[in-house]
């Protein structure tokens, strides 16, 4: 009887992928990128091993939101001081911090814990179409849908 081969750190081959966020919807892009970071697009996916690829997202400032989310969606953070609850609308986030907006959406879709933090480190988000990872020879990745 043959057993299912399990991936381990020495057998994983990681690729570098470039995803263009221009005109894409935030949630649809984020869920696909989270699956790539986890390695679910590979036949060698193993839940307890980080089998995912590196992802570079460009044109983060051109991400789209549907409906009235630009004005109604609010991002909260706390300074850890009394009365330190801060809030920003999605429009302010997209204008001033588009990288953070994408990172927060993708981070929420990854596993919580040390494996999820390790997967999140393989994500690179940039405003504009330039990125400093040309030496890794990234492949352009076309999203489904």
Swiss-Prot record:
GO cellular component: cytosolic large ribosomal subunit; ribosome
Transmembrane segments: none
GO biological process: negative regulation of translation; translation
A Pfam family the protein falls into: Ribosomal_L13
UniProt keyword terms in alphabetical order: Ribonucleoprotein, Ribosomal protein
MF terms in GO: mRNA binding; structural constituent of ribosome
InterPro entries linked to this entry: Ribosomal_uL13, Ribosomal_uL13_bac-type, Ribosomal_uL13_CS, Ribosomal_uL13_sf
Assembly and binders: Part of the 50S ribosomal subunit. Binds to Obg (AC P20964).
Family stated for the protein in its record: Belongs to the universal ribosomal protein uL13 family.
Role, per record: This protein is one of the early assembly proteins of the 50S ribosomal subunit, although it is not seen to bind rRNA by itself. It is important during the early stages of 50S assembly.
Protein name: Large ribosomal subunit protein uL13
Species for this entry: Bacillus subtilis (strain 168)
């Amino acid at each position: 009887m043959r057993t299912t081969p399990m991936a381990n750190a020495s057998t994983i081959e990681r690729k570098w992928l470039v995803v263009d966020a221009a005109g894409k919807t935030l949630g649809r892009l984020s869920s696909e990128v989270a699956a790539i970071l986890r390695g679910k697009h590979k036949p060698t996916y193993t839940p307890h091993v980080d089998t995912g690829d590196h992802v570079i997202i460009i044109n983060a400032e051109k991400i789209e939101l549907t409906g009235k989310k630009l004005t109604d969606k609010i991002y909260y953070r706390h300074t850890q001081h009394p009365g330190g609850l801060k809030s920003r609308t999605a429009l302010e986030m997209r204008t001033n911090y588009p990288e953070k907006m994408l990172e927060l959406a993708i981070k929420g879709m990854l596993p919580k814990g040390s494996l999820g933090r390790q997967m999140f480190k393989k994500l690179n988000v940039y405003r504009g179409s330039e990125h400093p990872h040309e030496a890794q020879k990234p492949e352009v990745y076309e999203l489904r849908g």
